[in-house]
Each structure stands twice: as C-alpha cells, then as structure tokens.
Regions:
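Conserved substrate/cofactor phosphate-moiety recognition/catalytic segment
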Residues: 18-61
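Conserved Walker
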Residues: 15
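P-loop (Walker A) phosphate-binding loop of NTP-binding proteins
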Residues: 8
Length: 168
C-alpha cells in the first residue's frame, strides 16, 4: 500500500504522515527533503522558488519510487505538495489499486478564523525556515487545490474547524 498525502503549505501533510507512520509503521518519503537534497547536492539548478518547474522534475523521480515500492510489495507514505493532480495517469490499474491519495485542504473560513493555529503549528513536526505566513496566499492555494481535486475526482480532506488542535 502506498499512501499519497498532498496539499498546500501548512495544511498538515507532514503531521499526518508522521501519525500514519507511527500507526502503521510505514516509511515516509518527504518530497521536500528529496527536493532539498537534489538542490543542495547540485543535481539540479532549480531553486526552492521554482515551484512550477519542481513539480514535473520531482514527480518523475517520486513516480518511479512509488512504482518500485509497489513492485517490491513495500508499503510507503509519500507526502508533499509536488504531486500533480493528474498523477493517476502515470499508473496502470493494478498500481492504482494499491495507492490511496488524499489532498488536505483548509477552507477559507478556517484560515480566516484560525490563522493563529496555522502559524503556531507550522513547526510541530519539522523546523521551517520560511518567511511570514501569508494567509491570503494560503486561501488562494487551498481554493485552487479544491477546484483541481474536484476536476480530477480526487479525494480531499477539508479542514474546516479546530481539527489542528490535535497537533498539541
């Protein structure tokens, strides 16, 4: 079984992956860690700001890791924002039967009413080296992700209330 966890920044992808790892004992592949390893090692000239270019670049690698895990009968959790919404097109029906996908999406109302939680929990699993959280940008990104999930018929988990408090 391969579990894919996608979503915008600050939605809790890494936290969910951590909790699933603890529950099921599946290893976790963080696409962000892969990205930074490739960038810092000089394997790519892309930078962390090259989001539009990073998705196809990283997905080509992650896709083949997923296929290898399935072929080897290994379980794996993959988390990150670099999973394209048309990801299902890259797998045959046998592979798709062994993949679970969820996109974490915070509603506009949640982000407006709980922006303090978003900031407070941003380092609950990992230490971030990011600038200030832009709630308007997060709202825009989450709304775009919801529309894409609906367009592609993908499963999403809407975060609409104080669900994040469980991170404490």
């Amino acid at each position: 079984m391969v579990i894919l966890i996608s979503g915008a920044s600050h939605t809790g992808k890494t936290l969910l992956a951590q909790k699933l790892m603890e529950q099921y004992r599946y290893p976790v592949l963080s696409i962000d860690l892969l990205k930074m390893g490739l960038i810092r090692s000089g394997q790519t000239e892309l930078t962390p700001e090259d989001d539009n270019l990073l998705t196809p670049y990283l997905w080509g690698i992650v896709r083949e890791i997923i296929k290898t895990a399935i072929e080897n009968g290994q379980s794996l959790i993959v988390e990150g924002c670099y999973i394209p919404f048309d990801w299902e097109d890259d797998f045959d029906s046998d592979c798709l039967e062994q993949i679970e996908y969820v996109c974490l999406i915070m509603t506009k109302k949640y982000l407006e009413n709980h922006s303090d939680d978003v900031v407070r929990f941003e380092n609950v699993v990992e230490r971030r080296l990011l600038d200030e959280v832009n709630i308007d940008k997060l709202i825009e990104e989450n709304e775009r992700n919801l529309a894409s999930c609906q367009q592609y018929g993908l499963r999403c988990r809407l975060i609409a209330n104080r669900l994040r408090a469980e991170a404490q």
